[in-house]
A protein has these predicted regions:
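Arg/Lys-rich, positively charged N-terminal/basic patches that mediate binding to nucleic acids
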Residues: 1-32
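Glycine-rich, flexible loop/turn motifs
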Residues: 8, 17, 49-52, 84-87
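Short basic (Lys/Arg) and small-residue
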Residues: 36
Length: 92
């Protein structure tokens, strides 16, 4: 199980500049990812989502999401007590 689903999310978390991610989004997403990685219960992930996380419909395995800002979302799976396959997505 990989903590990150793609290179963009890994770069953002590790502070590597990406032209396709605004700096303010990258900073906020990195903080949220840190919270997701530290979570030991799914309920802990609500802190990253400013009190809200949502289960995405029709996903297998179940996938959850929390808003980073505007059209930017973090999606992740919850498996064996931790967030995995975390991905920063631009839905715009």
């Amino acid at each position: 199980m990989q903590p990150f689903a793609d290179e963009r999310t890994d770069d953002v978390f590790n502070g590597r500049h990406r032209k396709d991610v605004p700096e303010s989004i990258a900073r906020r997403a990195a903080r949220q990812i840190d919270i997701l990685l530290a979570a030991t219960k799914l309920e802990d992930c609500r802190i990253a989502g400013r009190g809200r996380i949502a289960k995405r419909q029709n996903t297998e395995p179940p996938t959850f999401c929390c808003n980073t800002e505007g059209r930017w979302w973090l999606t992740f799976e919850w498996q064996f007590g931790k967030a995995v396959n975390i991905k920063l997505e631009d839905t715009g």
